[in-house]
Amino acid sequence: MITDYFSLEGKRALVTGAGKGIGARIATAFAEMGADVALVARTQSDLDAVATEIRQLGREAHTFACDVTDEAALTSVVQTLTEAWGSLDILINNAGAPGQGYGSLKKVTKARFENTIDINLTSAYTLTHLALPLLKAAPQGSIVNVSSALGWMVDRNFAAYGAAKAGMDQMTRILAYELAPSIRVNGIAPGAIETPSTAFISQNEDMYNATVRWIPQGRLGKPDDIALAALYLASNASGFVSGKIIEVDGGMAALPGTAIEANIARTMATE
């Protein structure tokens, strides 16, 4: 059956940024499709809530409350999973945030810039490096890096975040070449998605309308939209796909001048 290609039965996945929003939905979606899931996020209570959902589905869940910029903590995560599982089928590098690097060139110092790079790019590289032996121990590994439309879209105040996400996309392509054929590496570049961190858009009618005006599908994306793309890339359904970045943005990438979208919304918010 064609649906069998999407099954994750017997697979083991590690998802960062799994406490809320996109990461949480990826984790629970994978469990719905049969995977055991290890969850990484900063807040234990958030992790516990997601883990409860996964266990109610009859799947195994491990939780790790840590900062992804802490290499020692990531090393501990991998060591624990090595002992518990011995192999890893899927790695989802989803953790990310603008961090201290949001702002103009005048305001963002080198230290603040590096904070954003560490959160969004260095942490993903570090965890991928540490988890490589586990991924190689699986019959076929799959890495999915969640970047952002801001990796290609030009918008003021996002020099650090945009650089980090563009770097993640290029890292995805290079590692796809380097790790083939035993490990596939792909990426997802979300557009504007409804999550706790973007709730302010939906709560302001003018801002919402200004934002969706530049999205051909006429709405914000939902965590399910990203989880479905992640499921495709993590499963055997994409067995001949590697080195690709899937833009899940409601068609925004097809339009010229999409930098206007965020600028209008932000201008209206400050008026």
What is each of the regions a protein language model found here?
Residues 133, 176-181, 239:
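Alpha-helical segment proximal to the catalytic Tyr-Lys
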Residues 148:
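Residue(s) in the substrate-gating loop at a strand-loop-helix junction
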